[in-house]
Amino acid sequence: MIEKERRPWGWFKVLHRGDTYCVKELYIEPDMRISYQFHRHRTEDWVVVKGDGIITQNDIETECKVGDTFFIGIEQRHRITGGKRGITIIEVQRGDCKEDDIVRLQDDYNRVDHFAWGHY
């Protein structure tokens, strides 16, 4: 059985992992959001499979719904916010898929990497 890893914004679970990729399911609760972040060593593809929300990429917000897809490039700033029903996405990471490859620029849960702003 695949276990959910709780986060302040909801949860995720790893569906499959290989040497250079990782497939996850993420659920972001209504009106919650992940940190505004980027990754130095991986890309991500997101597919909305349930609910709705807002995707932010490089400061541009886009409403999203079931069936919408998004590509997150290396060092591209991004965030997802759950809509009134929350949002579930499938995320395919490619590259170095370690959890510590997250540089947080803004975070509602006090997990910001203060040195990160010097990068931009």
Question: Could you describe each region identified by the protein language model?
Answer:
Residues 59-77:
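Short acidic-glycine-tyrosine-enriched beta hairpin
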Residues 32, 41-42, 60, 76, ...:
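A generic "binding-loop/recognition-motif" signal
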Residues 2-7, 79-120:
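Double-stranded beta-helix
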Residues 2-38, 42:
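A short glycine-rich, His/Asp/Glu-containing loop-to-beta-strand
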Residues 24, 45, 88-91:
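Polar/charged side chains located within well-ordered beta-strands of beta-rich proteins
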Residues 41-54, 58-59:
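Glycine- and acidic-residue-biased ligand/ion/polar-headgroup-sensing regions
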Residues 34, 60-62, 101-103:
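Short beta-strand segments
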